[in-house]
Every structure is written in structure tokens, then in C-alpha cells.
A protein has these predicted regions:
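Transmembrane signal-anchor hairpin modules in multi-pass inner-membrane enzymes, especially those
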Residues: 1-83, 105-112, 116, 172-184, ...
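Alpha-helical transmembrane segments of multi-pass inner-membrane proteins
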Residues: 21, 112-141, 153-254, 274, ...
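Membrane helix-loop boundary segments at the extracytoplasmic
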Residues: 21-29, 592-595, 629-668
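Aromatic-anchored transmembrane helix interface
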Residues: 60-67, 81-104, 113, 126, ...
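Flexible juxtamembrane loops connecting transmembrane helices in multi-pass membrane enzymes
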Residues: 147, 241-275, 494-505, 509-546, ...
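Repeated scaffold domains used in trafficking and secretory/extracellular systems
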Residues: 266-273, 304-312, 345-355, 385-394, ...
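Long extracytoplasmic/lumenal interhelical loops at the membrane interface
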Residues: 531-546, 550, 554, 558-595
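Hydrophobic transmembrane alpha-helices and their immediate junctions
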Residues: 595-639
């Protein structure tokens, strides 16, 4: 009796930590791992106490063992043994999740409890994510940020986890033969989860979701679901309204009115006024000049898409390209002739051209000042933080970090010399700009200014976050996130705001003249961007894959070790591949690079075995309620994982691989417990 009581207490403890594990998949990796390791610990304690092996064979033992052996050999051969050993340990310690599930879900009732707990909290996480994405939907922030908010984890991880939730719900929706009330409930949950993955704005999760759902349709042979799926994809593609144009507004000093819209060949990025000439940086369309008839003459086809065009001096001009290089041109008889090009040492987030010098702020290498006339580096400061905005004039240089740290330097002969101000604001700073010796800032609640190294509050903030701002005739003109064009007047410490008009589409850039406003606007749909060779995230992936393949060719048997690949990538990449990442955004190439062909074979054996087991379980119970739906959803989730792994290193993502081992263990447990129950 005493033994039974002790075992019951241990079982309740296991159940408690299992609950933490199951309820935190989509919202807290810390709680999730606490739940897993403590549940596993008490399962082992239970086994020692009862003198019974709590674990059962799953059929994955031999491929798991081969994987561990390859990891050990690869670690020994790696030039970063310590790091490889750490990563190996992380991966190996997650493998027992499969066995933890089989040991703790000891009957069908417990299997259902495990799944229902997971899916309930996954749904709650989806609702929370949608609520926090409200501004992204309403104000169109997706087009600016390129992703949804990071609430519980990185948006790309959120999208993959959400795809699993959607696939499970889809499986229950089309497999269960229940009444309409049940179907409606599942459909509502499915729709809400679908909205949450849309809110991530991440194509990897979308791709995996589509693959998993398509696999389920294939397994069920319910071809009539294919048509609506195709219709939705095609309709989404055409409904995304891809466009690029230059818009002309009349301006009488008090309001703007749209006059003309001129479509462009590329993506109208920036508009630049140089003397009486106006230039449009049209991304892949190249550089265009606006003639007197408001028509575009394309005058330069740049080797990579152009983001911005500025004048260096009377004879030199600078084009900033998407790969962050600066391309310098001479102007001769109205024609631009290429002179030279150069780049900052890192991944440029922002730059300013001032007094023939280019000031760049790099994500990974700080501040660099270069002479635009010859590309010579005049100044380098690696800095002590990661900044992404820079502004400069004769007197001051200002840096801003994403967490609203503002640093101000004094200038001497074009070089920053003394730090005058350094402060991290408690509330977000949306934008800062220089005017003489004053730094103006718009925060969430207040407008601030910095003068003589001291910050003060100017006024309350009564407009949405400002995206672009420019000074003309003593006033500041700006575009905010509410699509409004406003004038800001600072007079003796007070601020007045004049609202001059509203844009239908958020401008990317603008130039104001005496009686005219010119804006550039473009929008590219997220689905269409999958096939865009000039999208930075796309060509960065291609560069990573090429480098990863070369790493494999140089280390074919056991790879370079299970390490962060950033340092190696620098050696393999081309000079203008500036974005440095520690993984290769592809499971299969990454595995080849870090573990060689032996590791690739071991992991493909594991994945192939799991795929076979998923099919076996589904085919065994496809006529059963709940069990068949769960097995079908598990198989669909695994297919989703395999497909999304084509563009993401999700095998190495702690949250994702934890989920995969859990689903695998749950499906195996389902098979074993149902078999035991007859």
C-alpha cells in the first residue's frame, strides 16, 4: 500500500510537469523545458523506485544511436570542439522527449489529455498573438517591418508552430464524422489559428502549412478540398495588389490634393531632388529621371537594385544598392558614367551623405566614415551597442538603437570626436532628426529635444509614429503611420501640428516643392515575394546555401562540427554578401555542412523512419474517431516540418524540434496504447 501511495504521488508530480510541458509549447520555451526535464527526472525516479524500465522501444533506437555517434566524431574533428560539444549535448538531450511521452501517457485517456492540453493552449496563444497584431493589420505595419510582432518567440518560429496547430485542426475538421456543432467549433478554431499565422507574415510557416494540409487532402483523397485551396492561393496572389508608382500632389501651403499617378517598372523606393532635376530610385528598375512632362526616363541599369541616389558634389553622384555597396558615378553631358564602388565593412542599416563623406551604421560592425570621392575609410568605431539609425551635420552626429538609446557626438572636420549625450529612453523613440545643434525626437508619449547635451520635453505626442520627415522654409513636414501628411512647427518650446492631407497608400519617400509634393509608393504581396530574386531575404538564402554546399565539399565525411557557422560563412561568402548568419536557412544543406554525409544519412534515416511510422499509425487507425484524426494531423505536421526545412534551419530550432519529438512520441504512444487496448 505504501508503495502504491508513493507511486501515485510520483505520478501526480509527473502529470504536473507534463502539463507545464504541454501548455507552453507555443508561448514559453523556458517553462516548456522545465516541464520536460523535471517530468523526465521523476519518470526515472519512478523507474528506480518500482524497479521497472519505464521506457519502451520505438524503432528509432538504431538511427538515434548512429546520429549520436556521428555527432561525437564530428565534435572531436571540429576546430571548435567546445561549441560543437555544447550543441551536440543540446540535441541529444531532446531525443528522450519521444520516450518521455511514451512513458507518461500510459493509456488512451492520457494520450487524449496530452493532445487536448497542447491544442487548447496553442489556440490561446494564437488568440493572444492576433490581439497583439492589431496595429499590424490596421496600420499596415507588415509592409514596413517585413514580419509580425515577436510576442513569445521570433515570428518565424511562431509561424511554424502555428502551422502545426492549423494542420491538427484541419485534420480533425475533415476526418471526424461528428455533428455540425462540433464541425463549426473546429472550423472557428481553425480560422482563428489561420489568422494568427497570417499575422506572422512569415512565408516559411505558410509554405509548411500548405504542404501539411495538401498531404492530409492527399491521404484522405478528398480532392474537392483542393479546389478551394487553389482558389484561395490564386485569389490571394492577385488580391495582394502589387504596384509601384510615383504620385504627384498639388500643395497650396495648407492642403495636398492628388493630381497624377505614374507607374514605374520596378519598385519606387526614393525620390531625390538635385537642383531642378528629380530622380527616382526604382529598385530593380534602376535609376530614372523625371522629365518636365512627368514621365520617367530610365538612365542607369544598376547591377543590383537601387535604394537611394544622392549628389556627392558638382560632378559626382552616389547610388546605394540593396547589397549595401555604394556605386559612384560621374556626370558628363547629362550622362552618368560609372567611376568606382565601395562598401562599408558590415551590413549597413542606414547611412547619410554629408560634405562628400558617407556615414554608415552597420548592424555588425558599428560606424564607418568613408570619402565618397575615392572610397577611403576615414574613421571606424565598432561601438558598444547595435544601432540602426544615423544622422549627421556640421555640428553633431546622432545614433539610435532599436531599444531607443540615443547617442550624440560632436563633430570636428567631418569626424565624430566627443560623446555629448548617451541615454536610453524608457519609452520607444520612433524617430529622431537633426536641425542645427538640436536633436528632435518623437517618442510614444512625448516630443523631446536634446540641446547642449541635455534632454527636455517639448510637448505631448498627438500624432502616429513618424516615418519620414523633411525641413522646408522653417517647418518640418512629415508622413506618419496613419498615412497623414503633417507640418510640425516648433516655436519657443511649443509645438503646433497642421494636418495637410491623407494618403491612400503609405509613401516610401517624399519630396516637397513650393507648390507640389512628390511621393514614391510601392507594395509587393507576400506570396509574390517568394519568387522575387531581389528580395534581400531570398538572395541571402541563396548565398548561404552556396556557402554551405562548399563547406560540405571541403569537409564531406563529418562536416565542420555542430557549430555556429557565422565565422566560417565570412570566409566562404562573396564580398557583397553582407548579412552574416550562423545557420544556413535549410535543414538539408546545414546538416551536410556541420555533420557531413554520415550525419546526413543518420538524420535522413531518422526522418524517413518517422515518416514511415506516421503512415503506419494512420493506416492502422484511419477509420477511428479522434485517434485517426490525431494520427493524420501528426503525419501532416511532420510533412510540414520537412517542407519548411527547405528554407529554415528548423531542425536546429529548440522550440520546433521539441515539438517534432513530442508529436512523434505521441503518435507512437497512440499506436502502442490502442494496440494494448485492442
Amino acid at each position: 500500500m505504501q508503495e502504491d501511495k508513493t507511486v501515485k504521488i510520483i505520478d501526480y508530480v509527473i502529470l504536473f510537469f507534463s502539463f507545464l510541458f504541454l501548455g507552453s509549447f507555443t508561448n514559453s520555451i523556458f517553462i516548456n523545458q522545465v516541464g520536460y526535464y523535471f517530468a523526465l527526472l521523476f519518470i526515472l525516479i519512478r523507474g528506480v523506485y518500482t524497479r521497472k524500465n519505464p521506457f519502451i522501444k520505438t524503432g528509432l533506437e538504431i538511427p538515434f544511436l548512429l546520429f549520436i555517434i556521428v555527432e561525437i566524431i564530428s565534435t572531436i574533428l571540429s576546430y571548435k570542439t567546445d561549441q560543437a560539444a555544447t550543441n551536440m549535448l543540446k540535441r541529444v538531450l531532446l531525443l528522450p522527449i519521444v520516450y518521455f511521452v511514451t512513458a507518461s501517457a500510459w493509456d488512451l485517456k492520457r494520450v487524449k489529455f496530452f493532445f487536448n492540453t497542447y491544442i487548447t493552449f496553442a489556440f490561446i496563444s494564437a488568440v493572444i498573438y492576433i490581439v497583439n497584431s492589431y496595429d499590424y493589420f490596421i496600420k499596415g505595419l507588415f509592409q514596413i517591418t517585413g514580419s509580425g510582432p515577436g510576442i513569445f518567440q521570433y515570428p518565424i518560429t511562431t509561424s511554424i508552430l502555428a502551422s502545426f496547430t492549423i494542420i491538427f485542426l484541419f485534420a480533425f475538421l475533415i476526418h471526424e464524422k461528428r455533428d455540425w456543432k462540433y464541425k463549426l467549433l473546429v472550423f472557428v478554431a481553425f480560422s482563428i489559428a489561420l489568422l494568427s499565422i497570417i499575422a506572422t507574415y512569415k512565408r516559411t510557416g505558410w509554405l509548411g502549412m500548405a504542404a501539411g494540409m495538401s498531404f492530409i487532402i492527399l491521404m484522405k483523397r478528398k480532392w474537392f478540398y483542393i479546389l478551394p485551396l487553389v482558389i484561395i492561393i490564386v485569389a490571394s496572389f492577385f488580391a495582394e495588389k502589387n504596384y509601384s508608382n510615383v504620385r504627384f500632389f498639388s500643395f497650396d501651403g495648407n492642403k495636398i490634393e492628388l493630381q497624377t499617378i505614374l507607374n514605374t517598372e520596378g519598385r519606387a523606393s526614393s525620390v531625390t531632388k538635385i537642383d531642378d532635376e528629380v530622380y527616382i530610385s526604382d529598385y530593380e528598375g534602376g535609376l530614372a529621371e523625371l522629365n518636365n512632362n512627368k514621365q520617367l526616363n530610365y538612365i542607369e541599369d544598376t547591377p543590383m537594385p537601387i535604394l537611394d541616389f544622392q549628389r556627392v558634389n558638382d560632378s559626382l553622384y552616389s547610388a546605394w544598392l540593396v547589397d549595401t555597396r555604394f556605386r559612384i558615378y560621374k556626370k558628363d553631358n547629362e550622362k552618368f558614367i560609372f567611376s568606382h564602388e565601395f562598401a562599408s565593412p558590415g551590413l549597413t542599416e542606414d547611412y547619410r551623405l554629408f560634405n562628400q563623406n558617407i556615414y554608415t551604421i552597420d548592424k555588425d560592425s558599428g560606424l564607418t566614415v568613408m570619402n565618397a570621392k575615392n572610397g577611403q575609410r576615414l574613421y571606424r568605431n565598432p561601438l558598444d551597442d547595435i544601432y540602426y539609425k544615423v544622422d549627421v551635420n556640421d555640428s553633431l552626429l546622432v545614433l539610435r538603437s532599436r531599444d531607443s538609446r540615443i547617442v550624440v557626438y560632436s563633430m570636428s572636420k567631418g569626424i565624430p570626436v566627443n560623446k555629448l549625450y548617451d541615454q536610453k529612453f524608457a519609452k520607444k523613440i520612433h524617430i529622431d532628426w537633426l536641425d542645427g545643434t538640436t536633436v528632435y525626437m518623437q517618442g510614444e508619449a512625448k516630443f523631446h529635444k536634446i540641446e547642449n547635451g541635455k534632454a527636455s520635453i517639448l510637448s505631448d505626442n498627438k500624432i502616429d509614429p513618424i516615418l519620414h520627415i523633411s525641413k522646408r522654409k522653417g517647418s518640418f513636414y512629415a508622413v506618419d503611420l496613419a498615412n497623414e501628411f503633417v507640418r510640425l512647427n516648433f516655436d519657443k518650446g511649443s509645438l503646433t501640428i497642421d494636418r495637410l492631407g491623407t494618403f491612400k497608400s503609405l509613401p516610401y519617400d517624399f519630396q516637397l516643392f513650393d507648390d507640389m509634393l512628390i511621393t514614391t509608393t510601392y507594395k509587393q504581396g507576400r506570396i509574390a515575394s517568394i519568387f522575387d530574386p531581389y528580395l534581400p531575404s531570398n538572395f541571402v538564402r541563396v548565398s548561404l546555401w552556396k556557402a554551405g554546399w562548399q563547406m560540405f565539399l571541403d569537409h564531406p565525411l563529418f562536416g565542420v562540427g555542430d557549430i555556429d557557422l557565422a565565422e566560417l560563412y565570412i570566409k566562404y561568402k562573396s564580398p557583397y554578401d553582407k548579412e552574416i548568419q550562423g545557420h544556413l536557412h535549410n535543414n538539408y544543406i546545414h546538416i551536410l555542412a556541420i555533420l557531413g554525409i554520415t550525419g546526413f544519412i543518420a538524420i535522413m534515416w531518422i526522418l524517413g523512419k518517422i515518416f514511415y511510422l506516421n503512415l503506419k499509425v494512420y493506416n492502422k487507425f484511419k477509420d477511428k474517431e479522434f485517434i485517426g484524426s490525431l494520427a493524420l494531423g501528426a503525419a501532416g505536421c511532420f510533412v510540414s516540418f520537412l517542407v519548411s526545412g527547405l528554407t529554415e534551419w528548423n531542425f536546429g530550432d529548440h522550440e520546433i524540434i521539441t515539438m517534432i519529438w513530442f508529436i512523434t512520441g505521441l503518435n507512437i504512444t497512440l499506436y502502442l496504447r490502442k494496440k494494448e487496448a485492442g
